[in-house]
Curated annotation (Swiss-Prot):
Transmembrane segments: none annotated. This is Large ribosomal subunit protein bL35. The gene is rpmI. Belongs to the bacterial ribosomal protein bL35 family. GO terms for molecular function: structural constituent of ribosome. PANTHER family: 54S RIBOSOMAL PROTEIN BL35M, LARGE RIBOSOMAL SUBUNIT PROTEIN BL35M. Pfam families: Ribosomal_L35p (PF01632). GO terms for biological process: translation. InterPro entries: Ribosomal_bL35 (IPR001706), Ribosomal_bL35-like (IPR021137), Ribosomal_bL35_CS (IPR018265), Ribosomal_bL35_sf (IPR037229).
Length: 65
């Protein structure tokens, strides 16, 4: 059986934690920031875990992570 290919786009966007969960950065922090509150922008800085409903698909496109 041939090797599975890792999705390079996904590999650059996700990291695996020590417990095996997928960590990701939040969206909506690139532009049009003037209308967003300071609190919103501060909360967007923090990384978060990938939702459990998406983990199965993410593991499929990231076979070696």
């Amino acid at each position: 059986m041939p090797k599975m290919k890792t999705s390079r786009a996904a590999a650059k966007r996700f990291k695996v934690t020590g417990t095996g969960k997928l960590k990701r950065n939040k969206a909506y922090k690139r532009h049009i920031l003037t209308k967003k509150t300071t609190k919103t922008k501060r909360n967007l800085r923090k990384a978060t875990m990938t939702d459990e409903t998406n983990v199965k698909n993410m593991k499929k496109i990231l076979p070696y992570m």
